[in-house]
């Protein structure tokens, strides 16, 4: 399980939170398998929230609940190497004002300076220069510095649901550009 891979990290996070929606789990803890509940004994915090913001759940609630802390997000369907957190923290030490990702893609433009389709953006595993053109790919692990989003429009639920319910990476990229927040990738996948 993904949760297991986080508990086996070389560097342990201060807190591990699993955000779930009451829409998906209306009976909350009663709807969860015992193997997930067993992780609470190791320190897992299971947090139920009203709205299911799909891929946005992984950052939306944590960045608000822990705005004064660095927050690392991961996906729920990948088993991570035991140095994921350490890699992101090392990258953060070098670039404390940038969002740090284990993998990024770069926004690409055509000859008329118009955006190319997302599918044509180049994926990068290593890009040690922070840039507004880098898009953090959430599935690979992302570290958000404390208080990174000073404009709170990024947390506007109604707009997320209307415009970008299944496009969390692009929603965040738009707000990073609006707030001049650069993204950098480390050597995790090299």
State what each model feature region is.
Residues 2-14, 22-23, 38:
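Short, acidic, metal-binding catalytic loop of nucleotide-sugar glycosyltransferases
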Residues 59-70:
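Active-site nucleotide-sugar/metal-binding loop of Leloir-type enzymes
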Residues 62-63, 79-158:
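Conserved catalytic core of nucleotide-sugar-dependent glycosyltransferases
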Residues 68-79:
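Short beta-strand-to-loop acidic/aromatic patch adjacent to the donor-nucleotide binding site
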């Amino acid at each position: 399980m993904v949760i297991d891979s986080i508990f086996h990290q070389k560097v342990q996070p201060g807190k591990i939170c699993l955000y779930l929606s009451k829409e998906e789990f209306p009976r909350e803890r009663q709807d969860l398998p015992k193997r997930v509940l067993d992780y609470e004994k190791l320190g897992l915090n299971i947090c139920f929230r009203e709205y299911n913001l799909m891929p946005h759940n992984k950052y939306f609630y944590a960045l608000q609940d822990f705005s004064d802390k660095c927050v690392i997000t991961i996906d729920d369907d990948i088993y991570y190497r035991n140095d994921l957190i350490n890699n992101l923290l090392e990258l953060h030490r070098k670039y404390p004002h940038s969002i740090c990702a284990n993998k990024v893609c770069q926004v690409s433009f055509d000859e008329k300076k118009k955006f190319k389709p997302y599918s044509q953006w180049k994926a990068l595993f290593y890009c040690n220069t922070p840039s507004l053109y880098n898009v953090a790919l959430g599935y690979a692990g992302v570290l958000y510095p404390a208080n990174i989003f000073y404009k709170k429009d990024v947390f506007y639920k109604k707009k997320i649901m209307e415009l970008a319910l299944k496009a969390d990476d692009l929603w965040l990229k738009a707000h990073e550009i609006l707030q001049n927040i650069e993204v950098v990738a480390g050597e995790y996948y090299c």
